[in-house]
Amino acid sequence: MKRLRVGDLVQVISGKEEGKQGRITKILADEDRVVVEGLNTVTRHQRPTPRNQEGGKITKEAPIHASKVMPVDPATGKPTRVKVRVGEDGKKTRVGKSGSAIGVG
């Protein structure tokens, strides 16, 4: 998955969370899915264990298929397609349609 990285700001383009934005916290490359902070939350019932004495209902983020999210262009604030541009020094950078670099650092 060359177009998405941990820490990228993405927007969900289809499904129940459509139009919402969040940062990627985890990438599951073998399943082609990503976990986005604060989106696609599910409630799981946790049984008490020696480590977790309380148990109860736990809310956590579930993975979303990578095809349902698009990186947000920092210049426009809108979802954009990503291409990889190779600089003169051979360094690769991901850029959006506006030409601005996408990514954390």
From Swiss-Prot:
<dbReference type="GO" id="GO:0006412">
    <property type="term" value="P:translation"/>
</dbReference>
<dbReference type="InterPro" id="IPR003256">
    <property type="entry name" value="Ribosomal_uL24"/>
</dbReference>
<comment type="subunit">
    <text>Part of the 50S ribosomal subunit.</text>
</comment>
<keyword id="KW-0687">Ribonucleoprotein</keyword>
<dbReference type="InterPro" id="IPR005824">
    <property type="entry name" value="KOW"/>
</dbReference>
<dbReference type="Pfam" id="PF17136">
    <property type="entry name" value="ribosomal_L24"/>
</dbReference>
<comment type="function">
    <text>One of the proteins that surrounds the polypeptide exit tunnel on the outside of the subunit.</text>
</comment>
<keyword id="KW-0694">RNA-binding</keyword>
<dbReference type="GO" id="GO:1990904">
    <property type="term" value="C:ribonucleoprotein complex"/>
</dbReference>
<dbReference type="InterPro" id="IPR014722">
    <property type="entry name" value="Rib_uL2_dom2"/>
</dbReference>
<comment type="similarity">
    <text>Belongs to the universal ribosomal protein uL24 family.</text>
</comment>
<dbReference type="GO" id="GO:0019843">
    <property type="term" value="F:rRNA binding"/>
</dbReference>
<dbReference type="InterPro" id="IPR041988">
    <property type="entry name" value="Ribosomal_uL24_KOW"/>
</dbReference>
<keyword id="KW-0699">rRNA-binding</keyword>
<dbReference type="Pfam" id="PF00467">
    <property type="entry name" value="KOW"/>
</dbReference>
<comment type="function">
    <text>One of two assembly initiator proteins, it binds directly to the 5'-end of the 23S rRNA, where it nucleates assembly of the 50S subunit.</text>
</comment>
<dbReference type="GO" id="GO:0003735">
    <property type="term" value="F:structural constituent of ribosome"/>
</dbReference>
<protein>
    <recommendedName>
        <fullName>Large ribosomal subunit protein uL24</fullName>
    </recommendedName>
</protein>
<keyword id="KW-0689">Ribosomal protein</keyword>
<dbReference type="InterPro" id="IPR008991">
    <property type="entry name" value="Translation_prot_SH3-like_sf"/>
</dbReference>
<dbReference type="GO" id="GO:0005840">
    <property type="term" value="C:ribosome"/>
</dbReference>
